[in-house]
Amino acid sequence: MLHPDARPSTLHLPPGDWPTVLDCLCQRFPAIDRQTWLERMARGRVLDAEGRPIDASRPYRAGLKVHYFREVPDETPVPFEERILHVDEHLVVADKPHFLAVMPAGEYVEQTLLARLCRRLGNPDLVPIHRIDRLTAGLVLFSADRESRGAYQALFRERAVSKRYEAICPALPGLPFPRVQRLCMVPGEPFFLMREGDGEPNSETRIEVLERRGELWRYALEPVTGRKHQLRLTMASLGAGICNDPFYPQLAERSARERDDYARPLKLLARRLQFRDPLSGAERLFESGLTLDW
């Protein structure tokens, strides 16, 4: 059995001539030394497809499925709690706080929404149906059942989900609203950024103004497409980058990006998700209980 309190990463061993699984892992992940892998194996943190521990003597076999539990020493706790809004046999809906990653990545393993929900609900089969950025707060949907998962994933793939965000950004008195903003989004530099390109638009966002307060306005953003950083780049391209965004329009210094300032969260909230349930046919509407302060 896989541990219910954590989600393993999975690797299908590539073709090669390594004598053992351990040798393959050491070459595949050069940043992790051999002793670390030995310690993980000794603690049952490296498993095969049946959930059986793999030890240092296990012979290598191309295509073998290996589950391993990523570990980050001294992982910094995120001092904000998620809120579970809905649970049924197929779906879990949660409000994610700012600064909490949805999935394990980089320096975040246990301090993720997925790991927290798996522990709280005792369900190791939870899988996010979509994702929002670590710095964004608001609604995230999880599949709680393997059999029905594909039906809900198809909703997002086919753009059958109405998504509404709120953002606080500088005022744009010179532009008419509501408006539809289309961009050609291409990979930028560094690799984790996106930028506006010269080709045909591949992203579309509907924008309206909800509230005006001096030099700052509250906007409703409805993405039709789902590009990486779409809302953040779209507002920056209009000259109204989302407040407290360390990436757009200007990339903050590395030292500032690597140190979360809990007093200055990104002013972006996944407010509402609406769709027709693929199983029951009922209209489903979920709204975040979080708010964006000015």
Residue map of PLM features:
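RNA pseudouridine synthases
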Residues: 1-294
